[in-house]
């Protein structure tokens, strides 16, 4: 066992002495040590109950004859951090989480790992850390919350609340109506109920085989979710107690190139958050897999978009997907298309393969998960755009775009920060036909690559979603919809063309040809570059300054450089 390094032999008597202080007995030194990486934090709705989940898991681990050691990571709630400088810390928190997993697991030589993530950057951070350690690992998330409901039965969620702010600003909704939405949008614990970043990533973990069947859709705080916790605990112990299984089920043996491909197939079929692209690029690097951004468009061409979930379809939420058959049903239905490549032979953590897992799955409600011959779209719900404005790529959630906006030409109106853009939108500067440009919000420029949910929600709430596009070197919340193009690389802070744009420049967007261009000649761009000096923001936070000096761009997953 890996843990023998801290518990076997006379030289480890001091180590055992310390472990005895935690309650261990002689017999415990013969058992596998299981890390339980929790992300319990009281301020996040998807995490405030995870201490109870960890207790269930630890109890089951003990019953199975192993020794659990719980430790915690930090967490940032993107919704609460939204709209102020707290959002600068969201993406950087992913790196702290990954580092904490690597640190605790390697410092204490634990044999195997269960991770309990749920929201935002916590899930990808835990995956990245687990890949570095490369021991058998099972992920079991906290689960999605129920959708809210208005008094008339209309389903709502957090995206409804953000967009309602725009309606109030435009005078189309009263503050009393906004208050009703505020009180009903998030009715229970869990990750926000739509196909936002948290649920997108929890779904993709299931698709990759590192989480058990049902992980992406079984609601939080239900008996079914608690049984999933117990199953995960039993399985990790079964693996850790068998040396052959321990070698076979190291996380890198499961989360390989085929698993990443399968994740993107599901992402396309369900129209996941654009943040999944950023995180999966980072995960692929940690897994040692070369997976270029351009490959996503090739996948998209051969995957039908068969499930629309809020924010793309505001009446459908994760609980509906669960009732309709869950992620396995989506995968099985998607695989029926002859040109869709889904690697059914790839292993899953419970044993067997993806093919074994989805063999008996079926779509129970075809109004929620569409038949393969009646998709929402013949192509996937995400696209990577290229052109002189995004030489290394930009990301758009095509599932959330009005059909009239799939090809769009508009005049640039430029803002050098998210707050400038918010002020401009609320001040009436943004008109139909504009392309809102928000720059210096990339990984380096922000620093921290803020989510632009406030501006996109204001645009949607002010009924400009089919008349205005937005491009940014920042990123978006999973709750964003509309012609919102993010992750523009290179970013302004590293000299990208987005930094050269001026008000009135003509910008051309075509999601069907994967194009993002400014209608300027190479000569004009080169002339502008002669006098261009990227802005550098005055940042007070020491961690943010360190992050800015180390982070790579969005096309590389915004991972940190190995060396300065």
Swiss-Prot record:
Keywords: 2Fe-2S, Amino-acid biosynthesis, Branched-chain amino acid biosynthesis, Iron, Iron-sulfur, Lyase, Magnesium, Metal-binding. One of its GO terms (cellular component) is cytosol. Pfam families: ILV_EDD_C, ILVD_EDD_N. SUPFAM superfamilies: IlvD/EDD N-terminal domain-like, LeuD/IlvD-like. It is an enzyme of class 4 (lyase). The modification N6-carboxylysine is found at residue 121. Pathway: Amino-acid biosynthesis; L-isoleucine biosynthesis; L-isoleucine from 2-oxobutanoate: step 3/4; Amino-acid biosynthesis; L-valine biosynthesis; L-valine from pyruvate: step 3/4. Its cofactor is [2Fe-2S] cluster; Mg(2+). The active site is at 477 (proton acceptor). It catalyses: (2R)-2,3-dihydroxy-3-methylbutanoate = 3-methyl-2-oxobutanoate + H2O; (2R,3R)-2,3-dihydroxy-3-methylpentanoate = (S)-3-methyl-2-oxopentanoate + H2O. HAMAP family: IlvD. Functions in the biosynthesis of branched-chain amino acids. Catalyzes the dehydration of (2R,3R)-2,3-dihydroxy-3-methylpentanoate (2,3-dihydroxy-3-methylvalerate) into 2-oxo-3-methylpentanoate (2-oxo-3-methylvalerate) and of (2R)-2,3-dihydroxy-3-methylbutanoate (2,3-dihydroxyisovalerate) into 2-oxo-3-methylbutanoate (2-oxoisovalerate), the penultimate precursor to L-isoleucine and L-valine, respectively. This is Dihydroxy-acid dehydratase. It comes from Nitratiruptor sp. (strain SB155-2). The gene is ilvD.
């Amino acid at each position: 066992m890996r843990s023998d390094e801290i518990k076997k032999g006379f030289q480890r008597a001091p180590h055992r002495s310390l472990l005895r202080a935690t309650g261990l007995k002689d017999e415990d030194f013969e058992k596998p040590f299981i890390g339980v990486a929790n992300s319990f934090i009281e301020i996040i709705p998807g995490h405030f109950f995870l201490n109870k989940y960890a207790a269930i898991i630890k109890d089951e681990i003990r019953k199975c004859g192993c020794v659990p050691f719980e430790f915690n990571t930090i967490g940032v709630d993107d919704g609460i951090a939204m709209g102020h400088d707290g959002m600068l810390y969201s993406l950087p928190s992913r790196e702290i989480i990954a580092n904490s997993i690597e640190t605790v697991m390697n410092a204490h030589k634990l044999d195997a790992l269960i991770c309990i993530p749920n929201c935002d950057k916590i899930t990808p951070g835990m995956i990245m850390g687990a890949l570095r350690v490369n021991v058998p690992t099972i992920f079991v998330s906290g689960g999605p919350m129920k959708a809210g409901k208005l008094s008339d039965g209309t389903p709502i969620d957090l995206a409804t609340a953000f967009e309602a702010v725009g309606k109030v600003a435009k005078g189309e909704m009263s503050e009393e109506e906004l208050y009703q939405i505020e009180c009903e949008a998030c009715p229970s614990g869990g990750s926000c109920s739509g196909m936002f970043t948290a649920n997108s990533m929890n779904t993709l973990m299931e698709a990759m085989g590192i989480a058990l069947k049902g992980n992406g859709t079984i609601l939080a705080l239900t008996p079914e979710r608690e049984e999933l916790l117990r199953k995960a605990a039993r399985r990790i112990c079964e693996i850790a107690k068998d040396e052959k299984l321990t070698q076979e089920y190291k996380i890198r043996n499961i989360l390989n190139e085929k698993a990443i491909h399968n994740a993107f197939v599901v992402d396309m079929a369900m129209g996941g958050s654009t943040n999944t692209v950023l995180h999966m690029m980072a995960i692929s690097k940690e897994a040692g897999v070369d997976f270029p951004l351009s490959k996503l468009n090739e996948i998209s061409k051969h995957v039908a978009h068969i499930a629309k979930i809020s924010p793309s379809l505001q009446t459908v939420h994760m609980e509906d997907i669960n009732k309709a058959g869950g992620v396995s049903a989506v995968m099985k239905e998607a695989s029926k298309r002859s040109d869709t490549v889904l690697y059914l032979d790839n292993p899953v953590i419970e044993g067997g393969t993806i093919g074994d897992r989805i063999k008996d799955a079926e779509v129970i409600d075809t109004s929620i998960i569409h038949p393969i011959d009646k998709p929402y779209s013949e192509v996937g719900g995400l696209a990577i755009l290229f052109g002189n404005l995004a030489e290394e790529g930009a990301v758009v959630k095509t599932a959330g775009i009005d059909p009239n906006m799939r090809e769009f030409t508009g005049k640039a109106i430029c803002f050098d920060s998210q707050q400038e853009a918010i002020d401009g939108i609320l001040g009436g500067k943004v008109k139909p036909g504009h392309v809102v440009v928000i720059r210096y919000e990339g990984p380096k420029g922000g620093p921290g690559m803020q989510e632009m949910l406030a501006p996109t929600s204001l645009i949607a709430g002010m009924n400009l979603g089919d008349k205005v596009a937005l491009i940014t070197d920042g990123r978006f919340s999973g709750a964003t919809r509309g012609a919102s193009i993010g992750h523009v690389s290179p970013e302004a802070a590293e000299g990208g063309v987005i930094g050269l744009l001026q008000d009135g420049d003509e910008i051309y967007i075509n999601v069907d040809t994967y194009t993002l261009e400014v209608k300027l000649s190479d000569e004009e761009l080169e002339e502008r570059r002669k006098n261009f000096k990227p802005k550098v923001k005055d940042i007070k936070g020491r961690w943010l300054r360190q992050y800015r000096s180390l982070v790579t761009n969005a096309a590389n997953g915004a991972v940190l450089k190995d060396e300065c």
